Amino acid sequence: MSLTRKRGFYKQDINKTAWELPKTYLAPAHVGSGAYGAVCSAIDKRTGEKVAIKKLSRPFQSEIFAKRAYRELLLLKHMHHENVIGLLDVFTPASSLRSFHDFYLVMPFMQTDLQKIMGMEFSEDKVQYLVYQMLKGLKYIHSAGIVHRDLKPGNLAVNEDCELKILDFGLARHTDTEMTGYVVTRWYRAPEVILSWMHYNQTVDIWSVGCIMAEMLTGKTLFKGKDYLDQLTQILKVTGVPGAEFVQKLKDKAAKSYIQSLPQSPKKDFTQLFPRASPQAADLLDKMLELDVDKRLTAAQALAHPFFEPFRDPEEETEAQQPFDDALEHEKLSVDEWKQHIYKEISNFSPIARKDSRRRSGMKLQ
């Protein structure tokens, strides 16, 4: 056996890729892969639980990849909330920094995501329960000083009992970091992100929740723009073209003159726009799909909306114990330096028992 590898690991080809796993994880099976890594499911023999294991794709290929891998590890480590995906374990088969090339993230296994089931009929109580969980997760994330910025149905994992977790913090950034306009899938993207037209904050995620909730209620994507301008046009058809008070908040001159060139129009009546929704659901959507970020609901305000009364438990609407601190966010480090930081994080990691909710809704997805 190679002295550069740890004992207690075994090799297995999964979907034409070599994986090296500790013997505590049994029956690995391919789940999916994307630009930044592949995921397999496995059984943790210590608990009997099914877990998801992510192998990052070439994490040390470049400074950008290495920094991204470090940030993903740190963010997952920071998350301790039942509606946010967090880290159960992290490991590397390497026994020293010199032989360290790959590492694996272990997370709770989730059966599907909202994207895959968006075509199904959602009853209003299912919408209540799922959106309530999205907002609980966001309240927690936002309290840590993090904006998700990429919230869309594919980033919302669900189990058959309607339990939901927010995924994918690869593109999340600290609120006080300069934000760029190319993040959320366009259809779920807040208008202030599309145009970078004004300062924006954590309520970009609330806009995304509004778009997702509307789609769950109607079975159709609310703002299905073909490009940026078409996206904005579709949004303004619903929100109305704003007046002078809003326009003077815009920092971007081109956006200012474009909005001023349009004839002013009122906001649509959301009870007419969503005829199948209850008045409370329409009212919540109206307040989440607010053009002015200063008037849009925060996650905490949205949770207090009467729409969630049947499921609400304020004790479960927890905040992060401390803000997320990524002291290296602005550092320009070499691949080797990022590698050292990641190796140290892995070596120092001690798993924390994750507590999920005491109560269950009794609902089933299908």
Curated annotation (Swiss-Prot):
Residues 25-308 form the Protein kinase domain. Belongs to the protein kinase superfamily. CMGC Ser/Thr protein kinase family. MAP kinase subfamily. It comes from Mus musculus (Mouse). The TXY motif contains the threonine and tyrosine residues whose phosphorylation activates the MAP kinases. This is Mitogen-activated protein kinase 13. Transmembrane segments: none annotated. Serine/threonine kinase which acts as an essential component of the MAP kinase signal transduction pathway. MAPK13 is one of the four p38 MAPKs which play an important role in the cascades of cellular responses evoked by extracellular stimuli such as pro-inflammatory cytokines or physical stress leading to direct activation of transcription factors such as ELK1 and ATF2. Accordingly, p38 MAPKs phosphorylate a broad range of proteins and it has been estimated that they may have approximately 200 to 300 substrates each. MAPK13 is one of the less studied p38 MAPK isoforms. Its EC number is 2.7.11.24. Its cofactor is Mg(2+).
